[in-house]
Amino acid sequence: MAIFNFLKLISPKNRILSKANRIASEVESYKNYYRNLTDQQLFEESNKLVDLVTKQNYTILDVCVAALALIREVVYRETGEFAYRVQIIGAFIVLSGDFAEMMTGEGKTLTIVLAAYVSALEKRGVHVVTVNEYLAQRDANNAMKILKRVGMSVGCNFANLSPQLKQAAFNCDVTYTTNSELGFDYLRDNMVHSYQDKKIRELHFAIVDEGDSVLIDEARTPLIISGPSKNEFGLYVAVDRFVKSLTEQEFKIDPESRAASLTELGIKKAEQTFKKENLFALENSDLFHKIMNGLTAVKVFEQGKEYIVRDGKVLIVDHFTGRILEGRSYSNGLQQAVQAKEYVEIEPENVIVATITYQSFFRLYNRLAAVSGTALTESEEFLKIYNMVVVPVPTNRPNIRKDRSDSVFGTPQIKWMAVVKEIKKIHETSRPILIGTANIDDSELLHNLLLEANIPHEVLNAKNHSREAEIVTKAGQKNAVTISTNMAGRGTDIRLGEGVAEMGGLYVLGTERNESRRIDNQLRGRAARQGDKGETKFFISLGDSLFKRFAHDKIERAISKLGNETFDSAFFSKMLSRTQKRVEAINFDTRKNLIDYDHVLASQRELIYKQRDKFLLANDLSEMIDKMLEKFVQQFCDQYRNQKNQNLINHIALAEALNLEMNMQNTINPKVFENMTFDVAVDKTRNLVAKKISDKVNVLTKPIALNRFRDIIITSMDKHWTEHLDSVFKLREGVVLRSMEHTSPLNVYIKETDILFKTMLQKIAQDVIVQIANLTTPDEFDHSLMQANALKKLAAIKADEKSNQE
């Protein structure tokens, strides 16, 4: 037992918490010192700390005690709030690059301001990442009032800001932004044609508010910037019609993964419908892909759960938060499949121009930290993926919330009747009640049931998210009845109205257990903030999604015994807990699988983006063009080897190709290469093309040539990178079938992606050299014009001669 206690003491989270407590004690010892300083003296003290960090090689951890004590006093003078000890502890955990788990109402927002100030002393930029623009704007406004007292600037990044205003926001010491807009700005920054047009100056330090939501829940959906492609309206409609005609014997859905596939009968039907001999043949891969998308859209996705339709548009709903994912759409044709299903306008399928996952994006930061009320259940994932230790921060006051045992019902219908009865009972006492639902459909079902029962209430879901803050703020007042999807678990405190504490505080009623215990804990966490009273309870049925998908057989047996009976069952609670852990493991594997694949693409993306920046910043491109020329010449000459003797060159074909493709204007005589060995011909070709490029520079002048060449290179890189992404996504889709050949799909993917990448680099080199060689100089333009005019005159003379003869 003594050994166990010792190991527990030295665990990373306990070690970090122990140090944070020591730091907090030291910070508290500075209280009187800073209280006795004037505002101007505090400002000067802050500047001294900046000098220590930026000029004298002190780290932020070296100065964090003085810095935290100083900003604590500044906050007090601005707001009247004196940061709690637990907020100092949380701020230190964040500064250490770890994950501070702080319960709802413990002051995460202020904790972030404290940590952001200390990190801002480095003058390299701090990004505070929030889940929506309302929170970003609210928190930025509050932070601005505090940090301007110590000379720190605060910016807020929005979706609709001009490029100039975005640059200004990111040039501030602290920038508040949403995770999606930040990710998209990063991708857009790597599509600019001038380095000065970039918005983000550096990915130095990010503090992610609601870190579990951003870094885990949203990690399964990559950020994608798309460009228009071909429109195959007719094929989408045909596939949709085909999928809707399938019988239960012609397709199947795996209940755990929710993956749909065709049975043997379905495959035969597809081949007959679309007149194909073999649906799995390479030439039919696009059709097969569209059928799989159609199956997912029609047989798996449900409106109100995965997406909603508003004003003729399909909008994705975040499964975990219930919020609409603004600006996001399904990729690789799935969006079009859903549009066909819902009979709305089918937009042209887009090609992926740039993409990144949140896992890959946030790992680009020099330092990353996060704050949330619920993270401990995913502590292994945060450590493995993001190298962050989850450290639970003690509450400022003891938590006295009552978490009652679940009530289990045989069917959803009986459960909903019981939910309404429970709401009515609580509402008659005037006690506020917050009801959490798993999706939009359930929230609207309950809304209709409460209308029938004449119980006044508010509904918060993705369809009316604009009133989120207003609805959640009032949810703690007397007589309030609030129905919400998982949205209510984030961002805005529910403060108790007068007299509510005496009633027992806020009553939180969950109507279904979520896939993750963490999401359940978020809902529970809405009650009993800062030592308030509160109570939580879940009503669940054996027909709920979690049971149906992951414990189907056990439930079938239980339903036959249970019938309509209702009881609090330790057996079902244990089964539920085991099921949730199993689902969490499955979801972790899904995200881990995503990052394993994305890691391959991430290394290529990083290389391309670094090369891109190098070209944008270079004042001399000659060395880089020489490297491209080296790649190009070998491949170019390879096409013209002598077929009978590979060591010789086909001198006539090579000379013709140079004159035609490299704009040599028939100056290359085939005799130049006659009887040359292949290697000598390669050297000769390199010299000829290099001279051609050098002549371009001399005629155009270096500044003009630099800009023209740079534009050619960047345009070519972007074009071929887009094509590469398309090839990689198609490869990834098809590579899963390799598992049937007893080979690792990931290993095949790594090998073939590497081949695709090298081919892409070769294509870029070829494209760039050919375009530069064919770049028209003023002299060449005049020569071409003279040739064209001469040809016109010749044609006119011939026409006159013909006319005279007639």
From Swiss-Prot:
Membrane topology: Peripheral membrane protein
GO CC field: cell envelope Sec protein transport complex; cytoplasm; plasma membrane
GO biological process: intracellular protein transmembrane transport; protein import; protein targeting; protein transport by the Sec complex
GO terms of molecular function: ATP binding; protein-exporting ATPase activity
Pfam families reported in the protein's UniProt record: P-loop_SecA, SecA_DEAD, SecA_PP_bind, SecA_SW
Localization per record: Cell membrane; Cytoplasm
Residues that coordinate or bind ATP: 87, 105-109, 493
Keywords: ATP-binding, Cell membrane, Cytoplasm, Membrane, Nucleotide-binding, Protein transport, Translocase, Translocation, Transport
Nucleotidyltransferase found in the keyword field: no
InterPro entries to which the protein is assigned, alphabetical: Helicase_ATP-bd, Helicase_C-like, P-loop_NTPase, SecA, SecA_CS, SecA_DEAD, SecA_motor_DEAD, SecA_preprotein_X-link_dom
Catalytic activity: ATP + H2O + cellular proteinSide 1 = ADP + phosphate + cellular proteinSide 2
EC number: 7.4.2.8
SMART domains the record matches: SecA_DEAD, SecA_PP_bind
Primary localisation category: membrane
Stored SUPFAM superfamilies: Helical scaffold and wing domains of SecA (SSF81886), P-loop containing nucleoside triphosphate hydrolases (SSF52540), Pre-protein crosslinking domain of SecA (SSF81767)
UniProt key word Translocase: yes
PANTHER family listed in its UniProt record: CHLOROPLAST PROTEIN-TRANSPORTING ATPASE (PTHR30612:SF0), SECA INNER MEMBRANE COMPONENT OF SEC PROTEIN SECRETION SYSTEM (PTHR30612)
Annotated function: Part of the Sec protein translocase complex. Interacts with the SecYEG preprotein conducting channel. Has a central role in coupling the hydrolysis of ATP to the transfer of proteins into and across the cell membrane, serving as an ATP-driven molecular motor driving the stepwise translocation of polypeptide chains across the membrane.
Similarity comment: Belongs to the SecA family.
Self-association and partners: Monomer and homodimer. Part of the essential Sec protein translocation apparatus which comprises SecA, SecYEG and auxiliary proteins SecDF. Other proteins may also be involved.
Name of this chain's protein: Protein translocase subunit SecA
Provenance organism: Mycoplasma genitalium (strain ATCC 33530 / DSM 19775 / NCTC 10195 / G37)
